[in-house]
Amino acid sequence: MFIVSKLLALALEPLFWTLLLLLGGLIALTRRPLLGRRLAWASLWLLLLSGWVAVPNTLLHALETRYPPPADGTDLRPFVGLVVLGGGLSDSSLWTSHKQMALNDQAERMTMAVSLAQQHGHLQLLFSGGIASLGGGGLTEAQRAKIFFDAMGLAPSRTLYEAASRTTFENAANSARLAGVDPHQRWLLLTSAFHMPRAMGVFQKAGWNVTPYPVDYRTAGDPSWLAYSLHDGPQRWQLALHEWVGFYAYRIAGMI
């Protein structure tokens, strides 16, 4: 499942298909010039389309608004802890090469976790994340998270770490097996808002009693249909397609 998910992520990259069409067009030009030109034009149109951010923003907005965050002033005393899903930390090589902590564009998963833990001293913090790269090696995300949370002043007695998971499905299954964790008690589930529908489905299917705490929003209200960026567009297309395809793939596989 892990390898399939990585191959699927590559297949959902708009620029991958742009390059594939362009290469196919160049190869076809020698024997079938008409086909070659059509493929080359298709690659150009796909590249231009990938910069139109309104469509992926609409897809992301639909995911992000499915689970609203808890209202201000919500009493969190009934919750025993906070499950934080990996994804907010930069690659292990950056940590080891520069001897510094490094967060990425999903950093709110980490910063909000610290904020909640500091505001609500009774909450146990459970971080779940292993090595999500095909090559493996280096510090697991849980090891990097421990360095970060320790540096932020969280007491080690309040933190638990699950370091084997590479997918959302494994996050739910492996975290439930940790000593001292009762998934039937009330937990907050913290992850990026666009990832929350899939995460909630998986955790609930695995028997967890979780309440969503979405962070890391990428959209705000109705998208502008005139917005265009060849820098942001392909990234947002990839993110939106990855989450929607992942959601339905998990549903078909019976994981949610």
Each language-model region and where it sits:
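Membrane-embedded alpha-helical segments of integral membrane proteins
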Residues: M1-L29
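Hydrophobic alpha-helical segments of integral membrane proteins
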Residues: I3-L8, V55, L59-L63, L241-Y248, ...
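Extended, histidine- and acidic-residue-enriched regions that form the cofactor-binding/catalytic faces
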Residues: L15-W17, V53, G254-M255
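Structural signal for membrane-spanning alpha-helices in multi-pass inner-membrane proteins
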Residues: G25-L29, G51, Y250
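Membrane-interface helix-boundary motifs at transmembrane edges
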Residues: L29-R38
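Hydrophobic membrane-insertion alpha-helices, especially the h-region
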Residues: R38-V53
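A structural signal for short, hydrophobic/glycine-enriched beta-strand patches
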Residues: L49-L230
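Extracytoplasmic/luminal low-complexity segments enriched in Pro/Gly and acidic/polar residues
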Residues: D216-R218, D222-Y228, G233-I256
